[in-house]
């Protein structure tokens, strides 16, 4: 370019570095119904003002970079940039702030959780000006959520397929999770289903290993399902894990499951990836398969309170990507989960409309419109003494999954399943009669022991088993 020639793009261009807050901190901004809203927990480096830190997050997760570039003049930054529109200190924490950021909808590809996360939780998490950064919540506008299929079927369709109403569903993860042959694995599946469970489950790391190849497992589990159905008169299922090293192999396994006529398959959605998960969800919708989702690897992302991403965000992402069940913690078992916080994201999974409620960790009102709901799965270190609390906490629209709490029964797998089914039926009956499960739970279980020797034996084995540790991730002090 000659010294005399000046383009429109270069007319107002001045090279150099500007403070992010000059362009990306806009407290006067009024959010739009179509904006994706994010709440970030920001811990700035010493000497970095919170406004600059919040603006940096908005910039680096949208249109900004570390220096002024002349190509800024070739587009409308005001139209496309993220905006930090509010910052508030975190009560009880030093040098932590919640930064609220609004993103224009045009920044995101329709129907792609992958693209949404690549922007919002991409490189910005390694930004040096921040000591730590955590995405606490997202508001997904209906204009964006309607571009997703969501769960393949949803809660009501699943109940209709299974012909099971008015109670939580019961499951069991087959143990040991690794090392069984396919035939012995199928035997355990049959015994649990015959004893009264609705589902059994592959553990998250059961894929296709030398001791048990996936096709053999699928065949023996299908045989177990059909035999148990014939003997009990109930529809049964086993979560056949279709997770694989490639999307093509994953779909091949799902196709084989469909050919066997089983009702449900499974996917590890975080280790498998959102693109693979969405592909499988579309296949399941088109072919009548339910989809169970395991959240393996979630604690790497969500457990630390000041860095990463809260599970409520992963739960919303799963509902958009697609899944009929997802593991959600137990509150009372061996895995992380505070009660009010857990119930907050359980409602985000199941309900159509959820009001903002900071007492449960919900930062934004969320309207899912007509997107089907997801059944939360309570699993991990639970047994028959937990049944009243689980029934009271999670309600009917849930799956209560007992692995060791079924297979660890002193009389075997089928009696373990019987004990869990009897305990559940007793709790549902007591609740329907108006009894207080939280206060009378142990008494209800003891009464049921009088006519179920299987339950009595289970109660004796697990009467002293508790997991009383403080959760790492708790709600903020009010």
From Swiss-Prot:
Single annotated GO MF: monooxygenase activity
N-acetylproline: modified positions: 3
Enzyme class: lyase
Catalytic reactions of this protein: 2 (2R)-3-phosphoglycerate + 2 H(+) = D-ribulose 1,5-bisphosphate + CO2 + H2O; D-ribulose 1,5-bisphosphate + O2 = 2-phosphoglycolate + (2R)-3-phosphoglycerate + 2 H(+)
Example GO BP: photorespiration
Modified residues (N6-carboxylysine): 201
Subcellular location: Plastid, Chloroplast
Active-site feature positions: 175 (proton acceptor), 294 (proton acceptor)
EC number: 4.1.1.39
Family listed: Belongs to the RuBisCO large chain family. Type I subfamily.
Additional comment: The basic functional RuBisCO is composed of a large chain homodimer in a 'head-to-tail' conformation. In form I RuBisCO this homodimer is arranged in a barrel-like tetramer with the small subunits forming a tetrameric 'cap' on each end of the 'barrel'.
Name of the molecule in the record: Ribulose bisphosphate carboxylase large chain
Gene: rbcL
């Amino acid at each position: 370019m000659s010294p005399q020639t000046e383009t429109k793009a270069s007319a107002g261009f001045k090279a150099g570095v500007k403070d992010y807050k000059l362009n990306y901190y806009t407290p006067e901004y009024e959010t739009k119904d179509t904006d994706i809203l994010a709440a970030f927990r920001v811990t700035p480096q010493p000497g970095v003002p919170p406004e600059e830190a919040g603006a940096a997050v908005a910039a680096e997760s949208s249109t900004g970079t570390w220096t002024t570039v002349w190509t800024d003049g070739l587009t409308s930054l005001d139209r496309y940039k993220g905006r930090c529109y509010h910052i508030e200190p975190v009560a009880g924490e030093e040098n932590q702030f919640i930064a609220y950021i609004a993103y224009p909808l045009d920044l995101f590809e329709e129907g792609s959780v992958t693209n949404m996360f690549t922007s919002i939780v991409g490189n910005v998490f390694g930004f040096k000006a921040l000591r730590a950064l955590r995405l606490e919540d997202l508001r997904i506008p209906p204009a964006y959520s309607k571009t997703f299929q969501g769960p393949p079927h949803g809660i009501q369709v699943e109940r209709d397929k299974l012909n099971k109403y008015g109670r939580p569903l019961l499951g069991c993860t087959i143990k040991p999770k690794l090392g069984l042959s396919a035939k012995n694995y199928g035997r355990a599946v049959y015994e649990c289903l015959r004893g009264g469970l609705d589902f059994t489950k592959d553990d998250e790391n059961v894929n296709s290993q030398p001791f048990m190849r996936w096709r053999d497992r699928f065949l023996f589990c299908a045989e177990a399902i059909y035999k148990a159905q014939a003997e009990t008169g109930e529809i049964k299922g086993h979560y056949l894990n279709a997770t694989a090293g490639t999307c093509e192999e994953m779909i091949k396994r799902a196709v084989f499951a469909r050919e066997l006529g089983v009702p449900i398959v499974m996917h590890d959605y975080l280790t498998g990836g959102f693109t693979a998960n969405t592909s499988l969800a579309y296949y399941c919708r088109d072919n009548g398969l339910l989809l169970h989702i395991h959240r393996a690897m979630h604690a790497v992302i969500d457990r630390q309170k000041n860095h990463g991403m809260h599970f409520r965000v992963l739960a919303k992402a799963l509902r958009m990507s697609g899944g009929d069940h997802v593991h959600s913690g137990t509150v009372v078992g061996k895995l992380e989960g505070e009660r009010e916080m857990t119930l907050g994201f359980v409602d985000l999974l199941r309900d159509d409309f959820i009001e903002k409620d900071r007492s449960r960790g919900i930062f934004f009102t969320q309207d899912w419109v007509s997107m089907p709901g997801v059944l939360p799965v309570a699993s991990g270190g639970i047994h028959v003494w937990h049944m009243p609390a689980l029934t009271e906490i999670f309600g009917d629209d849930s799956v209560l999954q007992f692995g060791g709490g079924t297979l660890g029964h002193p009389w075997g797998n089928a009696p373990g399943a019987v004990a869990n089914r009897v305990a559940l039926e007793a709790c549902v009956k007591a609740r329907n009669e108006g009894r207080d499960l939280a206060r009378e739970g142990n008494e209800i279980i003891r009464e049921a022991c009088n006519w179920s020797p299987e339950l009595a034996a289970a109660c004796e084995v697990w009467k002293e088993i508790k997991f009383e540790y403080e959760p790492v991730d708790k709600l903020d002090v009010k």
